[in-house]
Amino acid sequence: MAWIQLKIDTDNQHAEQLSDMLMELGSLSITYEDGKDTPIYEPNLGETPLWSHTVITALFEADYDLAPVVEMLKLQPYLGADFSHKIEQVEDKDWEREWMDNFHPIQFGRRLWICPSWREVPDPEAVNVMLDPGLAFGTGTHPTTALCLEWLDGLDLQGKEAIDFGCGSGILAVAALKLGAAKVTGIDIDYQAIDASKANAERNQVADKLDLYLPEDQPADLKAEVLVANILAGPLRELAPLIAEKVQPGGLLALSGLLKEQADEISQHYAQWFDMDAPVHKEDWSRLTGRRK
């Protein structure tokens, strides 16, 4: 089955109003795109921010008459009679197959591979983490996740205990266990992340070595030799004392989820507890590492 889509240029002040109107006029779905490559990094809790220049795509059935829709939109004062829009035919595809074809095994560091379950493992002798993309959690493709995986690959984790602070999909926790850690504790504020981490640990046969907690349930005396936190700069700053007290003296720390321009400030903040290393960058993102004093 083919489809037809209507693309409209608008701004963030009118995007939701326009979306509601398009749905009332028969659209089957609405998507938002950034019209000018303007990044949004850290929205406030409960906010769904949109770009100042937003492109709305409304999908309709192929035989739907869009002429009345366009005429109705021309009457809206925030668009005007000459509003920017485009109508395109969209061929139906096996979207699931196309989505799966876009994911390939990825190597991080020297030993570690992240592999989708439907792909053949490139190196059976390597440390292979089987992880399928799903939900809004890390799969290794984001620079911050990659930075943390590369750091873990470079450590001697044999027999050590680690903490994955903000575990998300559990990718870092599972990788640490596959790299030799004796035990990992994963902490996250989202119960969906706890479920995702558990499922991924089971898929990789390491669930018996992974303890998972919501913050309010974690042991009061929790400490480890290694802690990795791939969250955002704001929480990293606010939770610094809590994170620091979870790392044993001489233990190792890795922080990511922060932008290049945020790295120096966060590093200085943690320097009261850790001997901090120089930041490592990948694209616009940074990783900070240090050793507990």
Swiss-Prot record:
Principal subcellular localization: cytoplasm
Q: Where does S-adenosyl-L-methionine bind?
A: 145, 166, 188, 230
Gene Ontology cellular component? cytosol
Any GO BP annotation:
methylation
> What is this enzyme's class at the first EC digit?
transferase
Stated EC number for the protein is 2.1.1.-
Which family does the record assign?
Answer: Belongs to the methyltransferase superfamily. PrmA family.
The role this protein plays is: Methylates ribosomal protein L11.
InterPro entries (alphabetical): Ribosomal_L11_MeTrfase_PrmA (IPR050078), Ribosomal_PrmA_MeTrfase (IPR004498), SAM-dependent_MTases_sf (IPR029063)
Catalytic function, reaction form: L-lysyl-[protein] + 3 S-adenosyl-L-methionine = N(6),N(6),N(6)-trimethyl-L-lysyl-[protein] + 3 S-adenosyl-L-homocysteine + 3 H(+)
- PANTHER family xref list: ELECTRON TRANSFER FLAVOPROTEIN BETA SUBUNIT LYSINE METHYLTRANSFERASE (PTHR43648:SF1)
Molecular function via GO: protein-lysine N-methyltransferase activity
Q: Which HAMAP family match?
A: Methyltr_PrmA
Q: Where is the signal peptide?
A: none
Q: What name has this protein been given in UniProt?
A: Ribosomal protein L11 methyltransferase
**Protein localization:** Cytoplasm
Which keywords belong to this entry?
Cytoplasm, Methyltransferase, S-adenosyl-L-methionine, Transferase
